[in-house]
Amino acid sequence: MSSYFVNSFCGRYPNGPDYQLHNYGDHSSVSEQFRDSASMHSGRYGYGYNGMDLSVGRSGSGHFGSGERARSYAAGASAAPAEPRYSQPATSTHSPPPDPLPCSAVAPSPGSDSHHGGKNSLGNSSGASANAGSTHISSREGVGTASGAEEDAPASSEQASAQSEPSPAPPAQPQIYPWMRKLHISHDNIGGPEGKRARTAYTRYQTLELEKEFHFNRYLTRRRRIEIAHALCLSERQIKIWFQNRRMKWKKDNKLKSMSMAAAGGAFRP
């Protein structure tokens, strides 16, 4: 309220000391909202306000620095109780006021400048405190995020190591039936390249399939040999050798049969 009163007075009457104040000399004529100037701390205005004396010294820049404000605060605080309340006696307060100047022609008073400066400083201080609070909160959040990242780092590293380690996949083995297994393991390199080759033992299923094929055809083509080798899980060489041995056996059986038949026919000849 006090700052509003001073600023409005300075805007209407720029020449404060030259104008005789009216209706302010008698304490009874003052309303309740204007308190005693002696009870108000003059240092709060920051520019040497003493009572109602509005004679102030303008600085070159129009604003007051922190050093001038501090000095004026000390001077105002020491001189406030010693000086009288008003510079003019109460008998001269009824003189007619001069014509007010337009507000556009009035230069900004240092009181208003200091008042706005105080508002700006308060706004800046509140903004700085808000920025500091947000910075503190963001820093705490950053610390929390960093700690969370540090906690997640071991878990992620463990997952990465678990993923990087190849899981032991079972080796893909072909399905082997009992008739596909060999009864005797052949050792080709035991006796060297010129050593005796181990005999191959065929299963019943393999022997049966080979006998059926030999019954239909005693000689195999290359294509049919490959098909039988894949079907019986044997090599082409094994199929070829088996068919050779089977033909030799067949010839021997036929020769013995023909010889027996010839011998039997000669015996029954009359």
Swiss-Prot record:
Q: Which SMART domains match?
A: HOX
A cellular-component GO term for this protein: nucleus
What parts of the sequence cross the membrane? none
Where the record puts its DNA-binding region(s)? Answer: 195-254
Region span, Disordered: 75-175
Protein localization: Nucleus
GO MF annotation: an example: DNA-binding transcription factor activity, RNA polymerase II-specific
Q: Which UniProt keywords apply?
A: Developmental protein, DNA-binding, Homeobox, Nucleus, Transcription, Transcription regulation
Under PANTHER family, the record lists: HOMEOBOX PROTEIN HOX, HOMEOBOX PROTEIN HOX-A5
Q: What is this protein called?
A: Homeobox protein Hox-A5
Q: Which organism is it from?
A: Bos taurus
Organism taxonomic ancestry = Eukaryota, Metazoa, Chordata, Craniata, Vertebrata
Gene, per the UniProt record? HOXA5
